[in-house]
Amino acid sequence: MTDRTCLSIVLAAGEGTRMKSNLPKVLHRVAGLPLVCHVVNAVRGTGKSDVALVVGRGAEDVRSAVEKIAGPVSAFEQKERLGTAHAVLAAREAIARGYDDLLIVFGDTPLIEAQSLLAARERLAQGADLVVIGFRPASPHGYGRLIEEGGQLVAIIEEKEATDEQKKIGFCNGGLMALRGQHALALLDAVGNDNAKGEYYLTDIVAIAHGKGLNVTAIEVPVDNVIGINNRAELAEAETIWQNRKRRELMLSGVTLIAPETVFFSYDTVIEPDVVIEPNVFFGPSVHVASGALIHSFSHLEGAQVGEKAEIGPFARLRPGADLAEKSKVGNFCEVKNAKVGKGAKINHLTYIGDAVIGASSNIGAGTITCNYDGYNKFKTIIGDNAFIGSNSSLVAPVEIGDNAYIASGSVITADVPADALALGRARQETKEGRAKILREKYAAIKAAKSVSK
């Protein structure tokens, strides 16, 4: 982290036509979070930084998405598409406020890491005036080359303009930059548009800064940090890279993933050490799994809190508001939504628990349903400690079942049940001996008569 003031300009005005989508490109998601929000999280990870969004199509939606994670930000519309330097200058008002550092990043590079941006800012703190983030791809073909002389970056040369000798250079332009705030407007205003497209290219400020005798340098970051997203195939590739990073991070922190490539996490998933996750598990946003928990295969968790040594699945679904205490269990083909499950409570199979509180050590039998919705409103079911809910019971909310109560299997419970009570809510069984034989003979005769008449 650094204490220097910083303005991060996030370029998010691209049309994204290759995405073939009505959704602005930067709002497509990796690990459940919009691309642009990944970028904003990275710049915030470098220390104190104000954010200026340069937006185009879907401006309000883009701004709203960013403000959900970062609070109020400035947004500036790029009304004409006249190049990257022109896009940066759309935020002239913010730049003019005066900052120690200026970060220029792209809203479609979700894999940029805070440590890479921090390295660029640290170079500014050490005396650099302009820092370009570069990378070394397996093949540099098609990328702009970073031209260095005597430890200084002197120019960025595009592939089509490079000499044969320059094309041999493997150090390429990643597009992201950091520059000293006091020079920002002078450098940007000096960029011209004397080129075939008549556009203002941000890359030109390198040669301009070098010509002014400023300290211009480049740093190298991993290739995946500067991957831009232009189509759905690249979006999927970015998802794969992000997931692999997260899987490795968790395994190195003490989480067991039996088949890592089959487990998918969200941007904010928290898994504590000594959790074991079996194959084919999906984590949606806002999930926290405490130490020692076991997540069986084919489980889906979203907005859930899982306590220490709890057990989930297989084939379990935890929806937002599911809060499972220590050593509780939600087994196969169970769904839990907006419910607190007490310590040691068991919901073993084929059950729906919604808008409920289940006490410690209670047992919920197979096929139990909390009937929480009347078509208009949701109602709550409260089950005390050590209660036993027999299989195939329907608990019609609002209803409260006391501690140590016993609900007989197959019951429909519509009224509160006191502590230590036994409740039966079903018709009494009648057994008519010999009636089955009579019915079989009757139905056989009817069937035979139909066959003769054909």
UniProtKB/Swiss-Prot annotation:
The keyword Acyltransferase applies. The keyword Magnesium applies. CDD domains: GT2_GlmU_N_bac, LbH_GlmU_C. PROSITE patterns: HEXAPEP_TRANSFERASES. It comes from the Bacteria. It is an enzyme of class 2 (transferase). Pathway: Nucleotide-sugar biosynthesis; UDP-N-acetyl-alpha-D-glucosamine biosynthesis; N-acetyl-alpha-D-glucosamine 1-phosphate from alpha-D-glucosamine 6-phosphate (route II): step 2/2; Nucleotide-sugar biosynthesis; UDP-N-acetyl-alpha-D-glucosamine biosynthesis; UDP-N-acetyl-alpha-D-glucosamine from N-acetyl-alpha-D-glucosamine 1-phosphate: step 1/1; Bacterial outer membrane biogenesis; LPS lipid A biosynthesis. It catalyses: alpha-D-glucosamine 1-phosphate + acetyl-CoA = N-acetyl-alpha-D-glucosamine 1-phosphate + CoA + H(+); N-acetyl-alpha-D-glucosamine 1-phosphate + UTP + H(+) = UDP-N-acetyl-alpha-D-glucosamine + diphosphate. Its EC number is 2.7.7.23, 2.3.1.157. UDP-N-acetyl-alpha-D-glucosamine binds at residues 11-14, 25, 78, 83-84, 144, 158, 173, 230, 319, 337, 352, 363. SUPFAM superfamilies: Nucleotide-diphospho-sugar transferases (SSF53448), Trimeric LpxA-like enzymes (SSF51161). The active site is at residue 349. In the N-terminal section; belongs to the N-acetylglucosamine-1-phosphate uridyltransferase family. In the C-terminal section; belongs to the transferase hexapeptide repeat family. Homotrimer. This is Bifunctional protein GlmU. It comes from Brucella canis (strain ATCC 23365 / NCTC 10854 / RM-666).
